[in-house]
Every structure is written in structure tokens, then in C-alpha cells.
Amino acid sequence: MRLATFNILHGRTVADDLVIPERLRQAVQDLDADVLALQEVDRDQPRSHLADLTAVAADAMGAVSSQFVAAISGTPGATWMAATGRESPGTASYGIALLSRYPVLDWQVLRLPRIPAKFPMWLRVPRKIIVVHEEPRAVVVGRFDTPTGPLVVANTHLSFVPGWNRLQLQRIRRYLRVFDEPVVLMGDLNMAGRAPAELTGFTPLATHPTFPLAEPTEQLDHILLRGSLGPVVSSDAPLMPLSDHRALVVDLA
């Protein structure tokens, strides 16, 4: 079984600032994951040519189960509101997606608490402080029928605000307690090193720096396990043709 997580930067390539869905398709084919967690996923956004990037990825990997969960309704960086899951078809949205080559038994969605007020954020380029609203955050959880039995997989993209992302991760840990099956938590947790494993009590399946893309120095993207699966055969953080993150991949026996 191959697990992978990838923050796709809404399909954008940093080098040329272009969103070309075919690049995402090729990247997903190259990852060749059985279960794939994606973050920063666009649907019906003008900046990504109104493409459904979840559908592009699902077709590329041959997924039989996929679920997109919008965190934002509208356009990130412009006019938006927190998504509710009741948006009309065709509404521009942005969020996370979970895809699998295994049949899904059920889906669940958890909306995470967000900072209720605006807060200052330092931009390295240009060097200035701006006041922003924190983006809404969500978790998509799938329970899949795998050859070794039911497997629960959760995908999320946590806040970049130190401390707040820890509270969100603790909320996820409590939410996942109800499952008796092995649980995999994947995603861009915006926390480096062993902090996510220490906060959750989960086992890290891969330890590779994933950010920034060219010469990564921090592991912001994680694949964590509670319970027992097959042993890890290999893991990697491959350079992909898009995004500002590397993907994170784990192969299990």
C-alpha cells in the first residue's frame, strides 16, 4: 500500500506561476498512490481555469473513491466566506481532497475552530505586516475497505499560526478516538519535526523535509499512524512539477 500527501498550491508551479492541470495529472500519476491526501485544492476557480482539480487527480490515479471538502467558498486572497458544505454547484471553492483506489465505507467531515478576529502577519516579500483573517480549516475522514481490512484515513491542512494549529490538532486527535480501526492522519500540518507525533501520540511513518520545494529544510507535511499496519518498506519526499511543497510518500508491505 502506498500512502501520499501533497499540498498542491492550487496546481500552480512556482517557477513560471502557471496553473496547468496536465502537470497535476502527471504528478499524481508519478506518485502512484493507493490513498492520496491533497491540500490547497481548487474547484471552479478562475485562477485554475475553472477546473475540478480533485476530479483531475482522481482520474489520474484511477481512484474509485474521492471526496473534496471546501474550506472556503469564494476566492482565497479576495472575497470569500467559510464553506458550509451546502454550496451550490459551480461555486468557486478551495479546500482539501482525499482519494483512494479502495472503496469507501463512509465519509465524515470535521470543521475546525478558527481564530475569531483579524491578526497581524509578517510577509517576507514584500517586507511588511498585514492584517488578515485566518482561513477556515477542515478535516475529511474516509473509512476504506482495503485488502487488509478497514482503514481510517484523515486529511487536513492546519493553520500556520503557531499555537492555534496545536489546538486544531488536539481537536482532531479527540475526534479520531472513536475509531477502532487503524488510523492514518495525513496532511500539511504547518508544524515541523516531531511536534505532530508528540501531540497526537501517533507514529510518524516518514521523516523527510518537505518545504520549501527546491532545498527543503522543514517537514510541514506528515503521515502519522495510530494502530498497526504493515511495516514501512520505503519513504520519500519527491520533487514534483508543481507547488512550493514536496510530496510525502510511504510504502507499506
Language model: regions and residue ranges:
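Metal-dependent phosphoester-hydrolase catalytic domains
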Residues: V104-V109, R143-T146, V161-Q170, R174-V184, ...
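Active-site catalytic loop in hydrolytic enzyme cores
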Residues: S100-P147
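Conserved hydrophobic/aromatic beta-strand scaffold that supports enzyme active sites
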Residues: T5, I96-L98, V139-R143, N155, ...
